């Protein structure tokens, strides 16, 4: 991922076998329910989707339509994706490793704002990405562990 993009990474353990975790994270509709701010996910084809997000920025909220594309999938191990909206670009990876009956998940998301407010938005995203990735991790654990 480009070094200039604000980035957040979180590693966490899920009490579920790796094949179950991979199937969940490969399902854009199901994983969409774990991404903070996602209002809806429209799957366009097996590799592309349209995500509607609502993000709070201080007292304001901003809505985004993000088109995502799966760039790489190594089943049960690694996935790489990108997203684009009118005012931001995103890159992300998910890596899985078996831990007996559990699975270690490492999730990285990088976001770069575009347009006239890019510098301000990048600074905001730098501070927000850590909590966003941690919230995603907690939501995935809850969805898979019950």
Model-predicted regions and their roles:
Residues 125, 129-145:
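Short amphipathic alpha-helical signal-transduction/dimerization elements
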Residues 1-50:
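Hydrophobic ligand-binding cavity/cleft-lining segments
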């Amino acid at each position: 991922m480009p070094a200039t993009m604000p980035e957040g990474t979180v590693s966490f353990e899920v009490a579920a076998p790796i094949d179950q975790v991979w199937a969940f994270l490969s399902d854009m509709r199901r994983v969409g329910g774990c991404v903070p701010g996602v209002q809806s996910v429209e799957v366009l084809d097996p590799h592309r989707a349209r995500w509607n997000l609502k993000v709070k920025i201080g007292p304001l909220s901003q809505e985004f339509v993000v088109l995502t594309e799966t760039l790489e999938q190594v089943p049960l191990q690694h996935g790489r994706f990108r997203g684009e909206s009118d005012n931001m670009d995103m890159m992300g990876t998910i890596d899985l490793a078996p831990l007996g009956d559990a699975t270690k998940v490492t999730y990285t998301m990088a976001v770069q704002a575009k347009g006239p407010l890019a510098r301000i938005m990048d600074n905001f995203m730098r501070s927000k990405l850590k909590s966003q990735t941690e919230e995603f991790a907690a939501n995935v654990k809850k969805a898979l562990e019950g």
